[in-house]
């Protein structure tokens, strides 16, 4: 079994890969104020609750975009499973052309592009991740990292709106009934959901124009399923694509 840990800005996502199937997933709120001992108690209890047999875990792999927590989580995984975790970095084998990987490329985006290229080798691939940040990561047919576009995530944009406008209500993001909102909640949904769907399609179109080829477009992340119905150019939706990228790294290393 392989335990995969994806440390993101909002959540820490953990899942177990067993016989090619992902199971026993859970999420823990990312909190840099928690001590290592607190995280140890949380992770230990959640693994035990889900019946994860610690002695049957062969590998632990970790991706992190939160440097402050990386060492703490790594230490706790080593303590729980008695294994040295594989840490996602530019130096480990990933199936991409390492010479083309930008020094600042985040571990999560590296996982996304590695899996996108592995999954679809017939041409260039763009992986769109609807997370805290909205990211567009593109890799060539040959496995070259072509580049990334980044925008504020949908929830990030909504939170910014609330932070500067006291009278607006909290809104659950879902597909609006109309682009012409008749109350505050529907107006925000219309602006965010319809606006972001247009942003996504524009970046896809401009990237294809710049490269001179059609992209295979994959979407992942928390809100990908919600907004996907508004975007015509998505070829595939995979909510656990980043975890699959972690699994690929585990297989290659």
Where are these regions (language model features)?
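Gly/Thr-rich phosphate-binding beta-strand-loop-beta motif of the actin/hexokinase/Hsp70
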Residues: 1-25, 116, 122-145, 161, ...
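Active-site nucleophile and cofactor-binding loops and adjacent substrate-binding regions
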Residues: 102-109, 237-241
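Long hydrophobic alpha-helical segments typical of transmembrane helices together
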Residues: 210-253
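Phosphate/pyrophosphate-binding loops at sites that engage ATP/ADP/AMP, CoA/4′-phosphopantetheine
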Residues: 43-59, 203-215, 253
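N-terminal glycine/serine-rich phosphate-binding loop of ATP-dependent small-molecule kinases
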Residues: 1-91
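Glycine-rich phosphate-binding loop plus the immediately following alpha-helix
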Residues: 31-35, 105-112, 117-122, 146-189, ...
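Short beta-strand-loop/turn "lid" adjacent to the catalytic site in phosphate-handling enzymes
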Residues: 52-105, 142-147, 153-154, 183-193, ...
